[in-house]
Amino acid sequence: MPGVKVKETESFELALKKFKKQCEKAGILSEVRKREHYEKPSIKRKKKAIAARKRAMKKQRKMMD
């Protein structure tokens, strides 16, 4: 869980920036977006297969160059 200790001389903006960076590293925002709406398991499988196909095509294109 991200947490920031704020020093007396530190501004609020700097503390907020540090906190956002820690949240991004922890993957909290992406997790929240993923859980925002229920996704059926069949849809998850379909998205996973599409992503795998895209990765394979990208890898194949890279090997051709």
UniProtKB/Swiss-Prot annotation:
Keyword Kinase: no
Superkingdom of the source species: Bacteria
One BP annotation, GO: translation
Keywords of this entry: Ribonucleoprotein, Ribosomal protein
Single GO term (MF): structural constituent of ribosome
Pfam families (UniProt xref): Ribosomal_S21
InterPro entries: Ribosomal_bS21, Ribosomal_bS21_sf
Cellular component, GO, one term: ribonucleoprotein complex
Gene3D superfamilies referenced in this protein's UniProt entry, alphabetically: Ribosomal protein S8 (1.20.5.1150)
PANTHER family: MITOCHONDRIAL 28S RIBOSOMAL PROTEIN S21, SMALL RIBOSOMAL SUBUNIT PROTEIN BS21
NCBIfam families in the cross-refs: S21p
Alphabetical list of HAMAP family matching this protein: Ribosomal_bS21
Stated family: Belongs to the bacterial ribosomal protein bS21 family.
Protein name stated in the entry: Small ribosomal subunit protein bS21B
